[in-house]
Design a protein with these regions (language model features):
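Residues that cap or flank secondary-structure elements
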Residues: 50-51, 113
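Amphipathic coiled-coil/heptad-repeat helices and related helical stalk/stem segments
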Residues: 55-56, 117-118, 148
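Short regulatory alpha-helical segment in sensory/regulatory domains of signaling proteins that mediates
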Residues: 16-18, 34, 59-67, 125-126
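Short alpha-helical segments and helix-capping/turn motifs at coil-helix boundaries
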Residues: 10, 54-60
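Extracellular/periplasmic ligand-sensing ectodomains of membrane signal-transduction proteins
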Residues: 65-131, 136-144
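Juxtamembrane extracytoplasmic/periplasmic/luminal helical "stalk" adjacent to the first N-terminal
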Residues: 1-50, 147
Length: 149
């Protein structure tokens, strides 16, 4: 994008092209996640939290194709897994390049509860059914680190 400096239209196109490429690849990741979840669930009526771990290869592949996103995964709304809380299955690329699972605190009575259903990024996607860009904002509760999203 450095070649676009000084030309707002080219800079805007470069940013738009970057986001388009990432969103296109997220569609590929979503398809892979869907396949892995279906295979993991097998003949059971509902997914379980344990089934969600099957998305690790898709998240790892996505992160391997992109330098900027350092974490990827899926967010499952309340009642999809047969619980009232939903789930976040998120994988982060470490310094070594390997992926580690991030565990979110989804217990409403605990300090540091990650109440994702109240966040604008979750509600916009649920209400529109389309990808959304939110931020930038600092998200402290999500990964116990300050991250710019």
């Amino acid at each position: 994008m450095s070649d676009a400096r000084g030309d707002p239209e080219r800079a805007s196109r470069a940013v738009g092209d970057w986001f388009t490429a990432v969103y296109d690849d997220l569609t590929i990741m979503a398809t892979a996640c869907e396949r892995e979840l279906r295979n993991s669930r097998g003949t059971k009526a509902r997914l379980t939290e344990r089934n969600l771990r099957a998305i690790q290869p898709a998240a790892t592949d996505f992160l391997g194709r992109h330098e900027v996103p350092v974490a990827a995964g899926i967010v499952v709304g309340p009642n999809v897994l047969g619980n009232d809380l939903g789930a976040v299955e998120w994988w982060r690329r470490g310094d070594s390049g390997s992926t580690q699972r991030i565990v979110f605190n989804l217990s409403p009575d605990d300090p540091g509860f990650y109440d994702f259903v109240t966040f604008e990024w979750f509600n916009e996607v649920v209400s529109t059914g389309k990808p959304a860009i939110q931020g930038p904002y600092l998200d402290y509760a999500g990964m116990d680190k300050y991250i710019l999203t």
